[in-house]
Amino acid sequence: RTQAQIGGTDEVTAFHAALAELIARLDAWEKPAPIRNVLALHASQRATSNTLALWELVKAGLPADMEVQEICLRNGTMADCNGCSYTACLHFGEQGGCFYGGPMVDEVYPAVRRCDALVMLCANYNDALAANLTACVNRLTALFRQTRMYDKRLFGLIVSGYSGGDLLARQLISALNMNKSFYLPPRFSLLETANERGSLVKLPGIEAQAAAF
């Protein structure tokens, strides 16, 4: 119904158009090029974060010629989506921006455009993505209006204090793969449990797991 309203047509026609687009995309699919540019997004405090400790182990295993960019969304300036209408969101997207502007438009949008792989660094406190990461995902909608992410791989590093890491992995799949069109590789996420500060690096075999990932 929503696609029919956007396209100014009836639901059956909108369904057939969406189906034709999907078939054409599947028929033309090619394996994405090798990863050369990695973007890592997080909202953690480096001094105390087990999630960032896991990322450091993973990052250490990346090829030396791979470009890696990290953006911290913790500085308090990440406003959530304003809930603009489709036409308003499309308008801002066509201008390369978003209603609120700020770091999301100045830093995150250009970095997402450049990257071949997006790594979401997710600390699990309440079986949900952190508020700043959620706001970031929501505000990627304006970029998505103009840029499809079919050739950008999605990865997740998820560290829980107790349990529930699988719930965050599902949220990443739903929000960024199914909704925002990021390419989902096999075994895209690494889930670990580390409650106490600094305990992640003491987990048995963690360095080998991180290197393999």
Task: Give the location of each predicted region.
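Short, glycine-/small-residue-rich phosphate/pyrophosphate-handling segment
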Residues: 1-23, 149-189
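N-terminal beta1-alpha1-beta2 submodule of the flavodoxin-like/Rossmannoid cofactor-binding fold
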Residues: 1, 16-145, 185-186, 198-213
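Extended non-globular C-terminal regions
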Residues: 192-193
